[in-house]
Regions:
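Conserved glycine-rich cofactor-binding loop
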Residues: 14-15
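The beta1-alpha1 cofactor-binding region of Rossmann-like NAD(H)/NADP(H)-dependent oxidoreductases
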Residues: 40, 57-67
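Conserved mid-core segment of classical short-chain dehydrogenase/reductases
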Residues: 66, 88-102, 145-148
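Residue(s) in the substrate-gating loop at a strand-loop-helix junction
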Residues: 136
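Conserved glycine-rich Rossmann-like NAD(P)H-binding loop of the short-chain dehydrogenase/reductase
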Residues: 30-45
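C-terminal helical subdomain
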Residues: 176, 192-230
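Active-site helix of classical SDR
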Residues: 116, 152
């Protein structure tokens, strides 16, 4: 995909990867970047910086996403690329409350579903469009220390796969961004060793990898290339992979498994 002269929406644009993506898209000549965030002040700040448009939205609410799509297309024009980037990480295992699971599910999974539900038919009607969904390497592998995050990111990738093969013949293109650790507020509470096994990338580096992935129209965008090796190892010997993850879990002392007396 050529970013030049495209109308692009980025959720979670107030900080981290979303902010970096918005800046990169503007520098690449996007016609207009709509910066959306749950924090209206942050989304306006980045929009003002890049001469974009700010629209407040909480991606865990379908009504907000309906409004984001409708307002963007009514005021700016047809959306060429929608980046479903906003996500949350809650460090918990069996102790996670139902509301923790629900919030992770709505933000990390349903947000992608709601965007597709209300935008894909519009895109098909005009000949096609592009969706970029930020998932995580945790959706391909898993997440030590956070059951809601690992599970929800697996579901997000599963939905992205379904979209890609169901609507690919109707002009819908799709990429899934799956980084490991990125220097954002999201990893502030993570164990340092767990976060830095393959290096903590800056949001700018991730955004650059994303631009290349969009240019190549790759389904999986992996800023940490090691993830592909890990995924192949997992597929080739699941039991060995589980053993390796248990070893990492012990090393990081983040096990959520209840211990017997």
């Amino acid at each position: 995909m050529d970013i030049k002269n495209k109308i692009i929406v980025v959720t979670g644009a107030g900080a981290g990867i979303g902010r970096a993506l918005a800046i990169c898209f503007a520098k690449q000549g996007a016609k207009r970047v709509i910066c959306s965030d749950i924090d209206a002040i942050k989304s306006k700040e980045i929009a003002d910086l890049i001469d974009g448009v700010s629209i407040e939205a909480d991606v865990s609410k379908e009504a907000d996403l309906i409004n984001l799509i409708a307002q963007s297309e009514a005021e700016i024009g047809s959306i060429d690329l929608f980046c479903s980037n906003a996500g949350i990480l809650h460090q918990a295992g069996l102790d996670a409350l139902d509301q923790d699971w629900q919030r992770a599910w709505e933000t990390n999974v349903m947000s992608h579903i709601w965007v597709a539900r209300h935008l894909v038919p519009r895109m098909i009607a005009r000949g096609g469009g592009y969706l970029l969904q930020t998932a995580s390497a945790a959706g391909l592998l898993n997440q030590i220390g956070s059951a809601p995050y690992g599970v929800s990111k697996h579901a997000a990738i599963g939905f992205a796969e379904w979209l890609a093969f169901t609507y690919g013949d109707q002009g819908i293109k799709l990429s899934v961004l799956c980084p490991q650790a990125v220097q954002t507020d999201m990893i502030a509470g993570m164990d340092g060793h767990a976060a830095s096994l393959d290096g903590i990338l800056s949001p700018h580096v991730v955004a650059q990898a994303c631009l290349q992935g969009l240019k190549d129209e790759r389904f999986l965008i992996l800023p940490h290339p090691e993830v592909l090796t890990y995924l192949r190892n997992k597929a080739s010997d699941y039991d060995r992979w589980i053993g390796g993850m248990r070893k990492l879990n012990r090393a990081n002392d983040t096990s959520n498994t209840p211990k017997g007396k």
